[in-house]
Structures are given as C-alpha cells and as structure tokens.
A protein has these predicted regions:
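Catalytic strand-loop segment that frames the active site of acyl-thioester-processing enzymes
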Residues: 1-34
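Short beta-strand edge segments in extracellular beta-sheet folds
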Residues: 15-17, 112-116
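Residues at secondary-structure transition points
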Residues: 29, 33-37, 94, 116
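Short, residue-level hotspots on alpha-helical faces of the histone-fold
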Residues: 40-44, 48
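Hydrophobic beta-strand-centered segment that forms part of the acyl-chain substrate-binding groove
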Residues: 47-80
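Hydrophobic beta-sheet segments that form the core/acyl-binding groove
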Residues: 67-102
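C-terminal output/interaction extensions
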Residues: 114-131
C-alpha cells in the first residue's frame, strides 16, 4: 500500500442501453442515462484504479459522494469515466471523477473511499444478522 499516492488515474466506459436508462431503473421517467448508472461507473472506475496498489485481502468501499449530473445522454452513446486520486489520508482516499459522452462532459464531482480488510469488514457485516 505504500506505493499508493495522489495522481493514480483510472478510466472505464460503457454503452447506454435500455437497462441503464432512468425510466427502466425508476430514477426518472425519461429514456436517458440514469444518474445511478453514472455514479456506479464512477465508483467502479475509482475502485479499479487503486486495486493494484492494495495489500492482498483488501478492498475499498465507497463512503461519500458529491456528484453533479450535468447533461443527459441517449441510448446508444458511449459514456467514458475518468478518475484521479487527489487525496490519501491513511486508509481514506478521495477521487476527482468526471464522466463524458460523445458530446462532452456529463457529470463531475468527488468520491471518498476507504481501504478495508475484506475479512474483518465482512465479519462486522455478518454480525448484523446475528443480532
């Protein structure tokens, strides 16, 4: 984990399909790229960008989002996400996130993730069921 530092970048993309539109997901009534899908792509992009730097048996979990969805994207267009790690504070990671369609910027903001030990994290989660 010592190699993880500011400046790590990620990039991911997906095509807007019927399954990824607001009217299908219930997040809106129109046939445009759904905000939850854009956010999920941003989270995936950030998560994957730092995965090679994490110790074995560790992951990151999302804890905070401040995202603006700026423009609508129709079915069939490709959405590209870019992330940059802008802050590292022990296990806390902050990413700048931007999403683009073929016409330009459609979303931007920041995302916070924490590095967790997979086994300890899942043990804590499983304790909820036992209560």
């Amino acid at each position: 984990m010592s190699e993880l530092s500011q400046g790590v970048r990620g990039a991911q993309q997906e095509t807007v399909t019927e399954q990824k539109i607001a009217s299908t997901l219930g997040s809106g009534g129109l046939a445009v790229y759904a905000t939850p899908c854009m956010i999920a792509l941003m989270e995936y992009c950030a998560m994957e960008s730092v995965r090679p730097y994490l110790p074995q048996g560790s992951s990151t979990v999302g804890t905070r989002l401040d995202i603006k969805h700026l423009a609508a994207t129709p079915i069939g267009m490709t959405v590209r996400c870019e992330t940059e790690l802008i802050e590292v504070d022990r296990r806390r990671l902050v990413f700048l996130c931007r999403a683009f369609d073929e016409a330009g910027l459609i979303g931007e903001g920041t995302q916070e993730r924490f590095i967790v030990d997979d086994e300890k994290f899942m043990e804590k989660v499983s304790q909820k069921i036992k209560k």
